[in-house]
């Protein structure tokens, strides 16, 4: 791992521990999917930054593209994945390459996939055959943005990077790739991961607002497949072997310690070069899948995993599961970290999110942010409920629910989130 990456990671930990306030999760329409609740040995794999039309590095696959190598391996083990693709990075210039082994290896101001000055070999725009193969073999395609521009500043590792100006730019970029897949392949994407997990935008919005507009869910991951980090070995072959082992060993060790460790988890992988321009994933993926298979795991796409349960803390064994699944399709009932927290007392703000129409809740909040640069998570929904006489004008979002409007609920004295959802007249 390069010095800049080490310093960046250390700096991020310091900021998170001493400067950044504890993240407060709120109920919304978009939630960050890292894992789901299940006791079954089923997990998902995602592959970022492809498709890649260039060979693996080192090339020991007769010139096959890296994406083809990954697809061959997945097919061999009967696995399916979510390919988190980009559109095209050809417009990301002027730029120059950074130091090999650093986070800027492929570009100082922009990302370039699969490499700087090789943009015409990467992305959905230039790899029709690979996109069609991904779909024909029943994998999922998700939206990693068209140009792979970060949504806002990331000062430590990517301080020199150009970024989008705000919500409208982010939605336009996401929609460009969305329409490419829809128009050319009749495929509708439903999940997205922001470039480098940068969420905050300069205009007060976040990736969650962009995904609200796109009707997406936020695809994250709970386990790092590790193929993106370079080894410090100076010998190329030793470095490759070290990188391959760094991908295999953590999975094996986790399962030896707890055979159910990966139940419901999402494993992050890379469909491209690591920071040393090698592709250890081409050599390690088969071994990873072999180990998972030995422990009885089925590897699927994130979309399939969410069919098992769309929630992080509630599974099919919960008596309210089916109702919650149906409610979540049209109502905001889940926190941004994909937890339901059914035993917590419900607040007025959370109740407003259940009752207000999605369009009203989102549009009112967006309008307030555009005007004032900030808004509470529940401001749009609460204002609609108050204007329509459903909730009292004196009600505050943070207050706990003590009564429920009879038009929407069966009678109950249980004002936990479980009790309120159970009483809702769906």
Region locations from a protein language model:
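Short strand-loop junctions, especially beta-strand C-caps/beta-turns
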Residues: 48-50, 86, 195-197, 270-274, ...
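Sec-exported extracytoplasmic/periplasmic mature domains
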Residues: 75-79, 135-136, 175, 179-186, ...
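Active-site beta->alpha N-cap acidic-glycine motif
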Residues: 8-159, 165-189, 194, 291, ...
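N-terminal propeptides
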Residues: 309-426
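Extracytoplasmic/secreted proteins, especially bacterial periplasmic and envelope-associated proteins
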Residues: 42, 65-69, 126-129, 165, ...
């Amino acid at each position: 791992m390069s010095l800049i990456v080490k310093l960046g990671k250390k700096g991020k930990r310091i900021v998170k521990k001493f400067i950044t306030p504890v993240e407060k999760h709120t109920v919304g329409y978009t939630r960050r999917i890292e894992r789901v609740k299940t006791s079954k040995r089923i997990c998902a794999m995602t592959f970022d930054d492809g498709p890649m039309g260039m060979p693996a590095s080192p090339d020991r696959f007769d010139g096959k593209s890296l994406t083809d190598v990954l697809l061959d391996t997945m097919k061999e083990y009967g696995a399916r994945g979510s390919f988190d693709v980009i559109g095209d990075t050809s417009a990301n210039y002027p730029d120059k390459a950074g130091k090999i082994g650093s986070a800027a290896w492929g570009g100082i101001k922009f990302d370039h996939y699969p490499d700087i000055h090789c943009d015409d070999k990467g992305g959905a725009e230039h790899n029709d055959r690979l996109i069609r193969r991904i779909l024909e073999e029943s994998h999922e395609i998700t939206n990693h943005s068209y140009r792979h521009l970060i949504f806002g500043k990331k000062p430590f590792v990517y301080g020199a990077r150009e970024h989008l100006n705000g919500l409208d730019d982010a939605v336009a970029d996401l929609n460009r790739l969305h329409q490419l897949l829809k128009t050319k392949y009749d495929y509708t994407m439903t999940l997205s991961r922001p470039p480098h997990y940068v969420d905050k935008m300069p205009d007060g919005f976040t990736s969650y607002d962009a995904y609200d507009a796109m009707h997406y869910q936020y695809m994250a991951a709970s386990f790092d497949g590790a193929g993106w980090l370079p080894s410090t070995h100076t010998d190329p072959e030793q470095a490759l072997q070290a990188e391959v082992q760094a991908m295999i060993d953590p999975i094996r060790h986790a399962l030896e310690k707890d055979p159910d460790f990966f139940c419901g988890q999402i494993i992050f992988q890379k469909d491209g070069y690591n920071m040393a321009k090698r592709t250890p994933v081409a050599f390690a993926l088969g071994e990873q899948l072999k180990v998972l298979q030995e422990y009885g795991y089925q590897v699927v796409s994130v979309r399939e995993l969410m069919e098992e349960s769309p929630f992080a803390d509630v599974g099919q064994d919960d008596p309210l599961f089916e109702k919650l699944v149906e409610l979540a399709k049209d109502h905001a009932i889940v926190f941004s970290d994909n937890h339901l927290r059914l035993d917590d007392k419900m607040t007025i703000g959370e109740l407003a999110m259940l009752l207000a129409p999605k369009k009203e809740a989102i549009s009112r909040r967006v309008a307030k942010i555009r005007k004032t640069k900030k808004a509470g998570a529940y401001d749009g929904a609460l204002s609609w409920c108050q204007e329509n006489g459903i909730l009292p004008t004196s009600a505050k979002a943070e207050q706990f629910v003590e009564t429920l409007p009879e038009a929407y609920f069966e009678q109950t004295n249980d004002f936990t989130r479980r009790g309120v959802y159970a009483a809702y007249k769906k």
